[in-house]
Design a protein with these regions (language model features):
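PLP-dependent enzyme catalytic core of the Aspartate aminotransferase-like
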Residues: 2, 10-11, 138, 204, ...
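Alpha-helical elements of the RecA-like P-loop NTPase motor core of helicases
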Residues: 37, 151, 200, 258-262
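Short glycine-enriched loop/turn motifs at secondary-structure junctions
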Residues: 59-60, 182-184, 243-246
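Conserved PLP-enzyme active-site core in the AAT-like
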Residues: 1-156
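Structural preference for beta-strand elements that scaffold enzyme active sites
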Residues: 24, 46, 161, 187, ...
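Short hydrophobic/aromatic beta-strand micro-patches
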Residues: 67, 189-191, 251-253
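Short, glycine-/Ser/Thr-/acidic-enriched flexible segments
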Residues: 71-72, 169, 193-195, 227-228, ...
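Conserved small-domain helix->loop->beta segment predominantly found in fold-type I
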Residues: 116-121, 125, 130, 134, ...
Length: 273
């Protein structure tokens, strides 16, 4: 699931191309989470997550994970010498020859961890494990809330369009039913009539939504990317990134959906004359 628009990737189709070219497919599954999508079952080689988002669920940690499917032959070509060729630092050891299906994982530990030092601190690991215990329950609420709010926004005359893939009007709707049957996530954008200034006013007037650049939180978050995270880009670049001047991004949380709708309603009234 893409950021910011929440578009749904056809992983099996991309996986087929990757297999034909002899390259690994790496999927960032942060926004879908393992609850909504299992990329390895759809053909991915590696899956990455920002654990700061839904896995922990409350924005209290910084972390990430890499999940290795173990289904890629790193020695099938000369494209991956770090895994198939002798490693001088380990007396000529060949990672794929020695560790087989776990070659990438052990290379990440023996080389990546050694050189870069990325280690999740124990407290962050504890919070993350606690978050994962409630992942399925939270994602059900995230998706339910997102669908209700996106439907309301789509029917509001102050809104030009909504990108939520769970809506029947979305070009990704059928793909979602096929590949993401549990839901299309909880991140999407919508365009506000009134453009840039109206979006800024909207964000300034919300009371329940938090104006934060993070996503995947139990708290509902809002941001106008064109005036914040994507401000340095040209209008053409913003448009290409899905962060045009008239677009606001929402990360829907687990609060009461009707409360969130009332908050957006009053903020839109303040923003759009």
């Amino acid at each position: 699931i893409s950021n910011p628009g929440g578009y749904l990737t056809d992983i099996p189709a991309v996986a087929a191309v990757a297999e034909r070219l002899g390259v690994p497919l790496i999927v960032d599954n942060t926004l879908a989470t393992p609850y909504l999508c299992n990329p390895i079952a759809q053909g991915a080689t590696l899956v990455v997550h920002s654990t700061t988002k839904y896995l922990t669920g409350n924005g209290t940690v910084m972390g990430g994970v890499v999940v290795d499917s173990g289904n890629f032959d790193w020695s099938a070509s000369d494209k991956f010498p770090s895994l198939s060729a002798p490693e001088p630092a380990y007396h000529g050891l060949k990672f794929h020859e020695t560790f087989g299906a776990l070659a990438f994982t052990f290379h990440g530990i023996a080389i990546g961890l050694r050189d870069l030092g990325m280690t999740l601190n124990p407290q962050a690991a504890h919070y993350t494990l606690m978050g994962i215990e409630t992942l399925s329950l939270r994602m059900q609420r995230h998706v339910k809330n997102a669908m209700k709010i996106a439907t309301w926004l789509e029917n509001d005359p102050r809104v030009d369009f909504v990108t939520y893939a769970g809506l029947p009007s979305s070009p990704y709707f059928e793909r979602g039913k096929r590949l993401y049957p549990k839901g299309a996530g909880a991140l999407f954008t919508f365009a506000v009539k009134g453009g840039y200034e109206a979006c800024v006013k909207l964000v300034d007037n919300v009371e329940i939504f938090s104006h934060v650049a993070n996503l995947g939180d139990t708290r509902s978050l809002i941001i106008h990317s064109a005036s914040t995270t994507h401000r340095q880009l040209t209008p053409e670049q913003q448009e290409a990134a899905g962060a045009a001047a008239n677009v606001v991004r929402l990360s829907i949380g687990t609060e009461d959906a009707d409360d969130l709708i009332r908050d957006l309603d009053q903020a839109l009234s303040a923003a759009v004359n």
